[in-house]
């Protein structure tokens, strides 16, 4: 067993010197274990990951926990292998940290449980599967305009407080109830309270038995926040490759992965690139995203919340992620301010699955007509603001009336928000969604008040709400 000594501590980055000829490999895990000898010292059980070889038999490492109490001269042991974590059935219903240690107070994982390294190559080109199958979410705006692909990568883009985490929680709820497969939730750099709430909600709903969770909260050093994504992905890969399962991987929040990388990048001695991000941003993102894919054995469908700093989509962090995604769901602050939830922008959200050969001709035509109507309404808004509705042609007035009904009908109540809104959530099958919007476009509901279309599920609910108001249907 190779031993070394700590020679420098710079926050989360630690330099370790080894004997000549015994340098550990990149990504190897190193251990520091120290028992306090007096009240001024603290017990230390720290894992480091080798990031750089500096020369002169010295390596630069990233700490996977706080470096409080670490001093120069402490002994370091090379484990001879990368960080590994438990995988398989023993991980379901449990919550782990980046090292695969349980943090849910439910007892230890069996010592003989299989452990896989978190650093692994992406599947080979010939192993990949190329069939396209739609994943129904029960959320109208997504299923109609930016449908998700089974085994695809989906990004939920939005600034602070527009509903990314709530949307992810609703997707977990809907897909777990309808799809019933195995889910992995990787939460990093986000609020501990949200993770705790999510765990207890999943426990109460019974979904937790089919879910493995791994957390690296925002109070932790950048090391665990940077590696938790790989830890969660390793859990998902086992179920895909060894059991042939279709796995759902939820990531909240992808931006924090990049942010943690930029925190340690300068300390590792790298020259920062645009906006202070690490120069290896595209490489790190590619290494993560290329492992999330479908193979002949099974699939991993990943749904990733991605924070957009200051609502700027040209920021390098969200911009680098775009090229890897099959579908994007863009959350718009203006829609949230109008009380339209989920605040998904129907014109900015995209999906490569929105094609007639994949979703069918009727679905495609209805979706495109909805987008055309909303786009025309957007163009007319400046005229309306200056001259008012009276100056519009009869045709444009009709477009505006229908567009407003469509805009409101794209909203719906969520199951996971029921405790806040007091309104029951709704799951709408794709066929019902397409039928509802088709009938609105055909003018079947032009006579109903537009506010009745807000926060409902199926189109029949609009009719019932209008009847309750005394409107003739």
Swiss-Prot record:
What's the protein's topology in the membrane?
Peripheral membrane protein
Q: Which GO terms describe its cellular component?
A: plasma membrane; proton-transporting ATP synthase complex
Q: Which residues form a coiled coil?
A: none
Tell me the Pfam families matching this sequence: ATP-synt_ab (PF00006), ATP-synt_ab_N (PF02874), ATP-synt_VA_C (PF22919)
Q: Which PROSITE patterns match?
A: ATPASE_ALPHA_BETA (PS00152)
Keyword annotations: ATP synthesis, ATP-binding, Cell membrane, CF(1), Hydrogen ion transport, Ion transport, Membrane, Nucleotide-binding, Translocase, Transport
Superkingdom, according to UniProt?
A: Bacteria
Q: Which GO terms describe its molecular function?
A: ATP binding; ATP hydrolysis activity; proton-transporting ATP synthase activity, rotational mechanism
The main place the protein resides is membrane
UniProt key word Cell division: no
EC class (word): translocase
Q: Which Gene3D superfamilies match?
A: 2.40.10.170, Bovine Mitochondrial F1-atpase, Atp Synthase Beta Chain, Chain D, domain 3 (1.10.1140.10), P-loop containing nucleotide triphosphate hydrolases (3.40.50.300)
Q: Which reaction does it catalyse?
A: ATP + H2O + 4 H(+)(in) = ADP + phosphate + 5 H(+)(out)
Where is this protein localized, as stated in its record?
Answer: Cell membrane
| UniProt: ATP binding residues | 158-165
Which NCBIfam families does its entry note? atpD
Q: How does it assemble?
A: F-type ATPases have 2 components, CF(1) - the catalytic core - and CF(0) - the membrane proton channel. CF(1) has five subunits: alpha(3), beta(3), gamma(1), delta(1), epsilon(1). CF(0) has three main subunits: a(1), b(2) and c(9-12). The alpha and beta chains form an alternating ring which encloses part of the gamma chain. CF(1) is attached to CF(0) by a central stalk formed by the gamma and epsilon chains, while a peripheral stalk is formed by the delta and b chains.
Q: What is this protein called?
A: ATP synthase subunit beta
This protein's species is Geobacillus stearothermophilus
> Could you tell me the gene encoding this protein?
atpD
